[in-house]
Regions:
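Surface-exposed molecular-recognition determinants
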Residues: 1-354
């Protein structure tokens, strides 16, 4: 069996940097493969601006903000089109304002083509849902309308999701919730805050681990209020392309090594205690170690630079800091990571070191 099924991760995930001009412009990706994104996460690097998250299921201009509990908002001069190898944006603050530099993390699902699951007809799940899934890359975007009763929802992955990111879209404000398999089915993180990982959350996921076809939700306004709409971003691991795990910090400058099985393009790290969601990628550090530039997903702050945060290696991440946000002694951390290149290709060719 081949080590990986994805030799070119840029077909499914890319990080792109661009600068705003105050006018409508297209952003073209620079990876080996063209990537028409279905989920785009944009952040101004040099300005205090909200994170902007948009997807091709909910449609252009429909933004959610990772650092806020706000409902879905329509920004007419924000992201205005998903294109064959990138996207088009207007001149709005946080998207294309003059003098602002941006990073855009982009994932491919199914090109905007969705599947409607009629639960009563298919027998899959207890609640109707709409999903667009990319089973090769282990990513699906699911939308559904809450029932207010304990139920299950089809996700379309065909594999068990290790991570699900939930957000209520309408009616009233609610926290983002993150299910992470390493924390169990009665625990949740809040993407928009630095609160400690919430334990004993049986009222969210019904203390039930997702299956290869559905995830479970209980009667809770964060995930299942009657008649309100929700989006869930679901991820399952693909060897050599994505990994969702945990590690324990050692508190030393010669820090913990996290084996991923690939050279990372993006890693999002979160302590299970009170701390921020930290985002590191290979582009903002100019493609070289040490990776010393981070963005915080739960604040609107500009990116910051610290000495010797980590190295991106051919097979994982080596922490070079004793920072409490990534490597405090004895502290447990969760992470989500996607590849620039697999450690070994499907033909057995190893990647070169960074």
């Amino acid at each position: 069996m081949a080590y990986t099924t994805i030799d070119d991760p840029s077909a499914y995930f890319q990080t792109t940097l661009y600068s705003g001009t105050g006018s409508t412009a297209s952003v073209t990706n620079g990876g080996n493969s063209d990537l028409q994104p279905d989920w785009v996460w944009i952040k101004a690097r040099n300005a205090t601006r909200d994170h902007r998250l948009l997807d091709s299921t909910r449609g252009v201009q429909k933004e959610l903000v990772s650092n806020s509990d706000a409902v879905e908002y329509t920004e007419s001069t924000g992201l205005t089109a998903f294109q064959s190898d990138g996207f088009q944006h207007g001149g709005a603050n946080g998207y294309g304002a003059s003098g602002e530099n941006y990073v855009a993390w982009q994932w491919k699902a199914n090109g905007g083509t969705t599947t409607t699951n009629d639960a009563s007809s298919t027998g899959v799940g207890g609640l109707d849902s709409v999903y667009q899934a990319n089973t090769t890359a282990g990513f699906s975007i699911v939308t559904y309308t809450g029932s207010g009763s304990n139920t299950t929802v089809a996700h379309g992955l065909g594999n068990v999701p290790e991570v699900i990111i939930f957000k209520k879209r309408t009616d009233d404000t609610e926290d983002w919730l993150v299910y992470h398999h390493t924390q169990g089915n009665a625990s949740a993180g809040k993407l928009n805050t630095n609160d400690a990982w919430e334990t004993g959350s049986a009222s969210l996921f019904d203390s039930t681990t997702p299956t290869s076809s559905v995830f479970s939700i209980k009667t809770n306004s964060k995930v299942n209020d009657s008649s309100d709409t929700y989006v869930a971003y679901c991820f399952s691991e693909v060897q050599g392309y994505s990994k969702f795990g945990n590690y324990t910090g050692n508190g030393n400058a010669d820090g913990a090594f996290v084996y991923l099985g690939f050279k990372p393009a993006l890693i999002i790290v979160r302590a299970t205690d009170t701390d921020n969601w930290r985002m590191y990628d290979h582009k903002r550090a100019d493609g070289h170690n040490v990776i010393d530039v981070r963005i915080i997903a739960d604040t609107n702050a500009a990116e910051s630079q610290d000495d010797n945060e980590c190295d991106f290696l051919s097979n994982g991440v080596k922490w070079r800091s004793s920072s409490g946000g990534v490597n405090s002694d004895g502290q447990a951390y969760t992470y989500m990571a996607w590849a620039e290149h697999p450690f070994v290709s499907s033909k057995g060719v190893p990647v070169t070191a960074r």
